Amino acid sequence: MKLFSLLIIFGIFYQSLFADTATLPKIQNQEFPKEELKKQKIQIASMVTKEIAKTLPQKIDQYTTLISIKNDDATLVYTFDINSGAKSDEAIIKEDHSRMQRAVTQGVCQSSSKFLEAGINTRYIYKSAKSKKRLFVFDITQEACSKLK
């Protein structure tokens, strides 16, 4: 799946959100002060959620649609529908879990490192577009990123 395009979208949302936010200090070169992020992480997660929610649903690629976002304290929770065609839910879970988890974790770790360092974590939930069955849940934290190296 083309998860890279999703990660680009998240980076753009993050940058545009903070560039216009009066409650945060002005940041040169799009750098985010880690201490400010830590102090305001729940507020930031809530603001990110509100901004991204305005654009939903959003087709990510031919298989994947971002259908909702919410924040659970300082965790951004993204929910996606996967349209797998004729492939069964069980086959997707069995065949795609490891590959998807690694790709999603690597992408989020690269695009959101400042947020992860500040304690703003990410959870990706993937559901079947047909059955609505939960296929995958990936929790991405700074610790998960450090395990990739």
Model-predicted regions and their roles:
Residues V137-K149:
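Short, low-complexity, Pro/Ser/Thr/Gly-rich segments in the mature regions of secreted, periplasmic
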Residues Y14-A19:
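Sec/Tat signal peptide C-region and signal peptidase I cleavage site
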Residues T21-D73:
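N-proximal, solvent-exposed amphipathic alpha-helical segments enriched in charged/polar residues
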Residues F4-F13:
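Sec-dependent N-terminal signal peptides
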Residues Q58-K114:
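Mature extracytoplasmic domains of secretory-pathway proteins
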Residues T105-F136:
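A short amphipathic beta-strand at an alpha->beta junction
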Residues Q43-I44, N83, R123:
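Outer-membrane beta-barrel proteins and related beta-barrel translocases across Gram-negative bacteria
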Residues F80-S84, Y126-K130, I140-Q142:
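A mature extracytoplasmic/lumenal domain signature
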